Amino acid sequence: MANAIDTRHYDVIVAPHITEKATLLSENNAVVFKVADKATKPEIKAAVEALFNVKVTKVNTLTQKGKTKRWKGKPYKRTDVKKAVVTLAAGQSIDVTSGI
């Protein structure tokens, strides 16, 4: 768990994703993060373990496709967002709401 913090770890984790569903997942030792589009599961695991000093057991990722919207009659597409659901070991926790 004493992984060295690399500057690339800050590029992998973009922001915590705080929603009602993410709050329900936190009861099962899971935390949801918005991550870089090109980030892989091993990179996400290494970044979370190094930045938050916790043990990660599982990483699930998904890419939420951006919606097509209209502005002044012209269609445009919102950007895609990649999310990672990080499951922590028993007894581990991350408080992502402490800075809010």
UniProtKB/Swiss-Prot annotation:
Subunit details: Part of the 50S ribosomal subunit. Contacts protein L29, and trigger factor when it is bound to the ribosome.
The species this protein was found in: Novosphingobium aromaticivorans (strain ATCC 700278 / DSM 12444 / CCUG 56034 / CIP 105152 / NBRC 16084 / F199)
Stated role: One of the early assembly proteins it binds 23S rRNA. One of the proteins that surrounds the polypeptide exit tunnel on the outside of the ribosome. Forms the main docking site for trigger factor binding to the ribosome.
Family the UniProt entry places it in: Belongs to the universal ribosomal protein uL23 family.
Gene Ontology MF terms: rRNA binding; structural constituent of ribosome
Pfam family membership, one: Ribosomal_L23
A single Gene Ontology CC term: ribonucleoprotein complex
InterPro entries cross-referenced by the UniProt entry: Nucleotide-bd_a/b_plait_sf, Ribosomal_uL23-like, Ribosomal_uL23/eL15/eS24_sf, Ribosomal_uL23_CS
Family matches, as PROSITE patterns: RIBOSOMAL_L23 (PS00050)
Name of the protein described by the UniProt record: Large ribosomal subunit protein uL23
Domain of life: Bacteria
GO biological process assignments: translation
NCBIfam families: PRK05738.1-3 (NF004359), PRK05738.1-5 (NF004360), PRK05738.2-4 (NF004363)
